């Protein structure tokens, strides 16, 4: 299949002109940040609600991701509780990814971190979502036991210009892309699976937490 062109955005892109994004014809889907982290505490991305509504109204396939820095069970529970509240009533056509890159996560062993990520991903699946793991190549190589996460598609960031050899469902290939309707540089990815079709066939994407 021809890779899907996927954009990911958060509060840092400000108010986006979604009509201009759609008219550009350069984007097949959008990953929205649902939760960020401030001083180790999860908080809802202030642009998530608006962007989700705008993409849904325009028929733009949408997925999401949340930033994790949980190193304890209590922190994982707090993140998932905040995520549940933010996702209530939402429907997605792309995966919901766990963003695993925070330096604090390196305090865990690769195996322990993978176990924590797998537990969170399993929770996403109980909510009827297509669970995915996001990280970057060096983190995957040194801090995360990827062999324990093969049940979940990988969204891999690698900006060296060549598609990574590590198996992945999406490749984030730049952080300096440009898309009409958005001020400043943005992250761009290529999805190598037809996630809207996969979610549709499996009946996934309508949050049921």
Please describe what each predicted stretch is.
Residues 1-28, 32-121, 125-130:
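Substrate-binding cleft of extracellular glycoside hydrolase catalytic domains
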Residues 39, 71, 140, 163, ...:
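Flexible, glycine-rich phosphate/dinucleotide-binding loops
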Residues 81-98, 143-167:
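Structural recognition of alpha->loop->beta junctions
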Residues 127-142:
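Aromatic-lined carbohydrate-recognition surfaces of secreted/lumenal glycan-active proteins
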Residues 66, 135, 158:
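Short beta-strand/turn micro-motifs composed of small residues
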